[in-house]
Swiss-Prot record:
It comes from Xenopus laevis. GO terms for biological process: regulation of potassium ion transmembrane transport. Keywords: Cytoplasm, Ion channel, Ion transport, NADP, Oxidoreductase, Potassium, Potassium transport, Transport, Voltage-gated channel. Regulatory subunit of the voltage-gated potassium (Kv) channels composed of pore-forming and potassium-conducting alpha subunits and of regulatory beta subunit. The beta-3/KCNAB3 subunit may mediate closure of potassium channels. Increases and accelerates inactivation of Kv1.1/KCNA1 and Kv2.2/KCNA2 subunit-containing channels. May display nicotinamide adenine dinucleotide phosphate (NADPH)-dependent aldoketoreductase activity. The binding of oxidized and reduced NADP(H) cofactors may be required for the regulation of potassium channel activity. It is found in: Cytoplasm. This is Voltage-gated potassium channel subunit beta-3. Belongs to the shaker potassium channel beta subunit family. It is an enzyme of class 1 (oxidoreductase). Its EC number is 1.1.1.-. NADP(+) binds at residues 90-91, 97, 119, 192, 222-223, 248, 277-282, 288, 298, 357, 359, 363, 366-367. GO terms for cellular component: cytoplasm; voltage-gated potassium channel complex. The keyword RNA-binding does not apply.
Length: 401
């Protein structure tokens, strides 16, 4: 069975908001633009049933596929919330790198292709990312029950009381986010890194409060260590409060240890899932920084000198060499290295969703094509990739790191 990722202006206009994210009747397909036609290569689907779930995931994440879009959905950790395995992030892009018109087009195409998860933060573009996201959601008039919005709280302003994870800032910061988003609630509010100045009990109580007040459905952590997450869970259980359901963590071919050795243990013990970001290592895996830093690329932006240095460093050059070695595998699967890298992230135990960062429709469609690659990542192929990378973590590492 082959799933066509078709998207044209006509199909976008013809489908009502009630149809989106719901199975639709097949069309003639004459006006559709398939993934293959947008230059992106996808693997032959005849080899395996597209709905077949990898054995690695079948006993871990309950996964389903909507035939009309090909999108896969998973539970967020062991909660009941169903999220698309690919989500759309807004870091760097919304309110900054791209225009509001481009942002709207990206959200529309993503939503039409089954993406139901949109991630942002109060700090992104000094709040403009939330404003842009909220403005688009209001304009599109999609059913609020059909999508998931997540935001992150920590850096809200310059005043001492406008940042961190104090009860004051968690509550006031989330209220500010809701105002910018023009929403009554967010589905998940994340603590955007740990705050050493705020007691854990205060953080958990504040998160429980905003959930009980209807300002959020769930709460999670971002850039927290496994020990910190376990402490939050223990505090929640001790005082009959609400524990976190998810950790946002960086995860890609060259950043593996936390997601592969620490978070799976938390998933099995306390049900905390993983929502991962930067699957392409801020573009390093795409090959755009092989020789120089292109204009208008992320590494050329003000404040991203660290990325430029990383791209041209000796370590960056070694990583480029590893990526080149992955090309034959991608060729065998009839996909791009970008699609292979994203599918590789999706195959990891306990990963509920991978957040995408894109600045144009072509990138988005290519990234979405990773879903078709996922069923073809056999244990043998994963082992072959591990041998090329040479960085498979020791599964017995101390989870306190």
């Amino acid at each position: 069975m082959q799933v066509s990722f078709a998207c044209t202006e006509q199909t976008l206009r013809s489908r009502t908001s009630e149809d989106r994210l719901c199975p639709s009747r097949p069309s003639g397909g004459q006006n559709g633009v398939s993934m293959a036609q947008t230059k992106q290569r996808t693997p032959p689907m005849g080899a395996k049933n597209h709905n077949q779930v990898l054995p690695l995931l079948s006993h871990i994440l309950r996964e389903s596929t909507v035939k009309s879009t090909g999108m896969k959905y998973r539970n967020l950790g062991k909660s009941g919330l169903r999220v698309s395995c690919l989500g759309l992030g807004t870091w760097v892009t919304f309110g900054s790198q791209i225009s509001d018109e481009v942002a709207e087009n990206l959200m529309t195409v993503a939503y039409e292709h089954g993406v139901n998860l949109f991630d942002t933060a109060e700090v992104y573009a000094a709040g403009r990312a939330e404003r842009t996201l909220g403005k688009i959601l209001k304009k599109k008039e999609w059913r609020r029950s059909s999508y998931v919005v997540t935001t992150k709280i920590y850096w809200g302003g310059q005043a001492e009381t406008e940042r961190g994870l104090s009860r004051k800032h968690i509550i006031e910061g989330l209220r500010g986010s809701l105002e910018r988003l023009q929403l009554d609630y967010v589905d998940i509010v994340f603590a955007n890194r740990m705050d050493p100045n705020s007691p854990m009990e205060e953080i958990v109580r504040a998160m429980t409060f905003v959930i009980n007040q209807g300002m959020a459905m769930y709460w999670g952590t971002s850039r927290w260590s496994a020990m910190e997450i376990m402490e939050a869970y223990s505090v929640a259980r001790q005082f009959n409060l609400i524990p976190p359901v998810c950790e946002q963590a960086e995860y890609h071919l060259f950043q593996r240890e936390k997601v592969e050795t620490q978070l799976p243990e938390l998933y099995h013990k306390i049900g905390v899932g993983s929502m991962t970001w930067s699957p392409l290592a801020c573009g390093l895996i795409t090959g755009k920084y092989t020789d120089t830093v292109p204009e208008k690329s992320r590494a050329s932006f003000k404040g991203y000198h660290w990325l430029k240095e990383k791209a041209i460093s000796q370590e960056g050059k070694k990583q480029h060499s590893k990526v080149k070695e992955l090309h034959p595998i991608a060729d065998r699967l009839n996909c791009t290295v970008t699609q292979l890298a994203i599918a590789w992230c999706l195959r990891s135990e306990g990963v509920s969703s991978v957040l995408l960062g894109v600045s144009n429709i072509e990138q988005l469609l290519e990234n979405l094509g990773a879903i078709q690659v996922l069923p073809h990542l056999t244990p043998q192929l994963v082992t072959e990739i591990d041998q090329i990378l040479g960085n498979k973590p020791n599964l017995k590492k101390d989870s306190r790191a």
